[in-house]
């Protein structure tokens, strides 16, 4: 039994090997030889390069060549995609009528964002497209933001200028607290009394005090000659004190002195006067 099966297996293998190793017909061999090229060009030969150049010279369908003159005047060839339509005319700018602008401005004041049915209805009433209405509102919002930025800068400049002008006006009118030795800055008094100094101790003197009975009027002119800056004649007993007051620019009282020092020490008053410390004033009084 085993020998018969072995003989059958050997026969099958021989038949299969014969089928595989069977040569092709002469016709098939000739056809395959005719299809194969007889010679192959070398990789670096001129024929291969010429074929590659000829194939690359043909531009693809999505590209086109144009001649452009550069800054030096020489012509250059540029390859651009055909999708870039350079010959297309520019879109004409939309010109709105006065009625359309008035209606659009009124709607913008009411609501800065018009969308949906409101925009459709507004475009229909004004005989415009929704795109035109949308673009107009976008440009109007951009313009408003720019105007607000300019207004804020202008307000800051105007406020600084107004503050400077008010300070200069007050300095000219003499309403600011200033030393009495500076007649241009001291307000003239209509009526007042000059009180004699009270001696608090030996070797110490106190400054005279002034009491005004009427409020200051800015329209009054300075006092005539023969009167002091307080618009009252100086008594004979206080002649030396008046000379000291005219020679030393001192304030009338301690509170006024502190206030004037605060005012004069600020940056707005630096170009017009200099602040004097308490120590220097006390030294001048003792001298």
From Swiss-Prot:
UniProt record, GO biological process: brain development; central nervous system development; neuron differentiation; regulation of transcription by RNA polymerase II
Keywords: Developmental protein, DNA-binding, Homeobox, Nucleus, Transcription, Transcription regulation
Keyword Cytoplasm: no
Cellular localisation: Nucleus
DNA-binding interval(s): 89-148
Basic and acidic residues: compositionally biased ranges: 1-33
InterPro entries from the UniProt entry: EMX-VAX-Noto_Homeobox_TFs, HD, HD_metazoa, Homeobox_CS, Homeodomain-like_sf, HTH_motif
GO molecular function, one term: DNA-binding transcription factor activity, RNA polymerase II-specific
An annotated GO cellular component: nucleus
Purpose of the protein: Involved in ventral eye development.
Entry similarity comment: Belongs to the EMX homeobox family.
Protein name: Ventral anterior homeobox 1b
């Amino acid at each position: 039994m085993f020998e018969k099966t072995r003989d059958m297996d050997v026969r099958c293998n021989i038949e299969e090997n014969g089928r595989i190793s069977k040569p092709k017909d002469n016709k098939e061999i000739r056809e395959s030889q005719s299809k194969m090229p007889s010679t192959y060009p070398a990789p670096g030969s001129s024929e291969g390069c010429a074929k590659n150049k000829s194939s690359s010279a043909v531009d693809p369908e999505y590209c086109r060549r144009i001649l452009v003159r550069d800054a030096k005047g020489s012509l250059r060839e540029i390859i651009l995609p055909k999708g870039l339509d350079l010959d297309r005319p520019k879109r004409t700018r939309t010109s709105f009528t006065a009625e359309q602008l008035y209606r659009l401005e009124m709607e913008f004041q009411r609501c800065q964002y018009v969308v949906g049915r409101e925009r459709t209805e507004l475009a229909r009433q004004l005989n415009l497209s929704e795109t035109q209405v949308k673009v107009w509102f976008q440009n109007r919002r951009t313009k408003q933001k720019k105007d607000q930025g300019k207004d804020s800068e202008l307000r800051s400049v105007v406020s600084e200028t107004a503050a400077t002008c008010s300070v200069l006006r007050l300095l000219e009118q003499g309403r600011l607290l200033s030393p009495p030795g500076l007649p241009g800055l001291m307000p003239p008094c209509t009526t007042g009394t000059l009180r004699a100094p009270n001696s608090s101790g030996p070797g110490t003197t106190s400054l005279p005090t002034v009491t005004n009975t009427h409020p200051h009027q800015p329209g009054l002119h300075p006092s005539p000659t023969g009167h002091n800056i307080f618009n009252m004649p100086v008594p004979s007993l206080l002649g030396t004190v008046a000379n000291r007051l005219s020679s030393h620019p001192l304030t009338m009282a301690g509170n006024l002195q502190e206030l004037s020092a605060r005012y004069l020490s600020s940056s707005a008053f630096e170009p017009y006067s200099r602040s004097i410390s308490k120590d220097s004033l006390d030294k001048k009084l003792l001298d």
